[in-house]
């Protein structure tokens, strides 16, 4: 299979040195993204497009390659093509007929040709010759250049002919690694996950910092969605996940700060801590999922007061987005279900929050706060690479594993719905229920408490994590299913 990758349009207007640097970075990223699927993958080209060639013939692996490329920043679109040496017009006609002849009977069509290089003919001459030949030989209803039912597309590059089989959309943006790096304040909800996606799509390596306000389930959920975002949109780069224990900080605010200023104070403490993390990691900006007046702390006066605690640039990609648009985007990128089942703690911190915070007043409230508490939180922060975050968490957990399902036991497939669809878990004589990992904690209580449940995932890591959490919650009827 050969693919021709067309770069994001804004890359093409850059200066020659910048353009070449971006293309080289994109080629490097494509190799990194597809390396595990084909170690012999070839990526060539350095100007306005890249040619990707693989010898893989397995249809499932090819589909996975295409899916990964559609989620790789820097790509405008890419083409599946069949490559041939460039022959005469009759040879071009024969190649197009071989690929499109069966589709043309009784239908209108158009021929589109693009060329690069010097030739003794024009693109229009190719289109006319091939179009008339296909109409004559394939029983087409006619030629329609405006709204054809079938498009016969090709590209001619020097002495090579590419007949285009299919076009796939790209993510756009710049290649990850070509721009600066940022730190995303991640709560795991709709807003922060979409904000992270927007930054990654634009081409910025996005690291994650999570402020744990007092819930192991919340931390696990945020780790899972951060891992998902990295795996789907940022896997070409090394990304960090930093978790900062903020329970003491919340306790200090609840006991020392006036109710109306609790929310603003909490956000200021988060920005202070995030700025310290960003400074240590030499990151260029902070990213939040805030939108104007979506909640009380996000009014302009409050945001202004919040930002005063840091000199680090704070980016808010969703600042004028409507909530429904954010939810729709989350659904499109695959984070909506994570967000829907994510525990939320921030909203309970203040009963009557101010929408017009005054700098002098918030400074007065913060004077009561023991900053040593914030320092301790930063000292206790943990840092992992996001690709290993789930595996490392599950390594030392002691959970009973079984290799055989006993009569009456139910196997719960907690894999992502995409994995469940691609490879359904079928066990003869065994009841299997699909309940994705991001929903298992919130929905397990709905299941029959008198039955025994075995959690299943491919590697056993995610199932061990969630079984351990459910056991800690008091559910004694859960184990891990690890078939031999």
Swiss-Prot record:
Q: In which pathway does it act?
A: Cofactor biosynthesis; thiamine diphosphate biosynthesis
Q: Which GO terms describe its biological process?
A: thiamine biosynthetic process; thiamine diphosphate biosynthetic process; thiazole biosynthetic process; tRNA 4-thiouridine biosynthesis
Cysteines paired by S-S bonds: 346-457
Where in or outside the cell? Cytoplasm
GO CC entries: cytosol
According to its UniProt record, the EC number is: 2.8.1.4
Pfam families (alphabetical): ThiI, ThiI_fer, THUMP
| Main location as per UniProt | cytoplasm
Q: Where does ATP bind?
A: 185-186, 267, 289, 298
Q: Where is the Rhodanese domain?
A: 405-483
The record's active-site residues are: 457
Catalyzed chemical reaction(s) = [ThiI sulfur-carrier protein]-S-sulfanyl-L-cysteine + a uridine in tRNA + 2 reduced [2Fe-2S]-[ferredoxin] + ATP + H(+) = [ThiI sulfur-carrier protein]-L-cysteine + a 4-thiouridine in tRNA + 2 oxidized [2Fe-2S]-[ferredoxin] + AMP + diphosphate; [ThiS sulfur-carrier protein]-C-terminal Gly-Gly-AMP + S-sulfanyl-L-cysteinyl-[cysteine desulfurase] + AH2 = [ThiS sulfur-carrier protein]-C-terminal-Gly-aminoethanethioate + L-cysteinyl-[cysteine desulfurase] + A + AMP + 2 H(+)
User: What keywords sit in the KW lines?
Assistant: ATP-binding, Cytoplasm, Disulfide bond, Nucleotide-binding, Redox-active center, RNA-binding, Thiamine biosynthesis, Transferase, tRNA-binding
Domain THUMP residue range list = 63-167
According to the UniProt entry, its GO molecular function terms are:
ATP binding; CCA tRNA nucleotidyltransferase activity; tRNA binding; tRNA-uracil-4 sulfurtransferase activity
Q: What is the similarity comment for this entry?
A: Belongs to the ThiI family.
Entry function: Catalyzes the ATP-dependent transfer of a sulfur to tRNA to produce 4-thiouridine in position 8 of tRNAs, which functions as a near-UV photosensor. Also catalyzes the transfer of sulfur to the sulfur carrier protein ThiS, forming ThiS-thiocarboxylate. This is a step in the synthesis of thiazole, in the thiamine biosynthesis pathway. The sulfur is donated as persulfide by IscS.
What protein is this chain from?
tRNA sulfurtransferase
Q: Which organism is it from?
A: Pseudomonas aeruginosa (strain UCBPP-PA14)
